[in-house]
From Swiss-Prot:
Disulfide bonds: none
One matching Pfam family: Ribosomal_L20
Its biological purpose: Binds directly to 23S ribosomal RNA and is necessary for the in vitro assembly process of the 50S ribosomal subunit. It is not involved in the protein synthesizing functions of that subunit.
Protein name listed in UniProt: Large ribosomal subunit protein bL20
Keywords for the protein's UniProt record, in alphabetical order: Ribonucleoprotein, Ribosomal protein, RNA-binding, rRNA-binding
Gene expressing this chain: rplT
InterPro entries, A to Z: Ribosomal_bL20, RIBOSOMAL_L20_CS, Ribosomal_protein_bL20_C
């Protein structure tokens, strides 16, 4: 059986890892072992943070909606409750965009929510 020489494969693997780590500081961009270790951590962080990004954006949207709703005299939870009662199905991303870029449309939605809240019966405390 012929002997398998793996020098080409090993060099390619090392070159790939060092290219991926090219922007890192110090030994992490120059030494294979340090670069490989850093790449393992980096990939773990990027995997985790791609999932965390969804929640971060939702939190940002809610903060923006709350600020705009309070400027119009409603809190976030009352505003969302009023929209739900009135049957308006606009997601938080669009609401946040309206709050930042189209204050007139957002104010109209606040009025719709306020009207729905006024028409709805108040829950009685048991």
């Amino acid at each position: 059986m012929a002997r398998v020489k793996r020098a080409v494969n090993a060099q390619k693997k090392r070159r790939t890892v060092l290219e991926q780590a090219s922007g890192y500081r110090g030994q992490r961009s120059r030494l294979y072992r340090k670069a490989k270790e850093q790449m393992l951590h980096s990939m773990t962080y990027s995997y985790r943070d791609r999932r965390a990004r969804k929640g971060d954006f939702r939190q940002l949207w809610i903060t923006r909606i709350n600020a705009a709703a309070r400027a119009n005299g409603l809190t976030y939870n009352r505003f969302v409750q009023g929209l739900k009662l009135s049957g308006v199905e606009v997601d938080r991303k669009i609401l946040a965009d309206l709050a930042v870029n189209d204050a007139v449309a957002f104010t109209a939605l606040v009025e719709v929510a306020r009207a729905a809240l006024a028409a709805a019966p108040e829950p009685t405390a048991a």
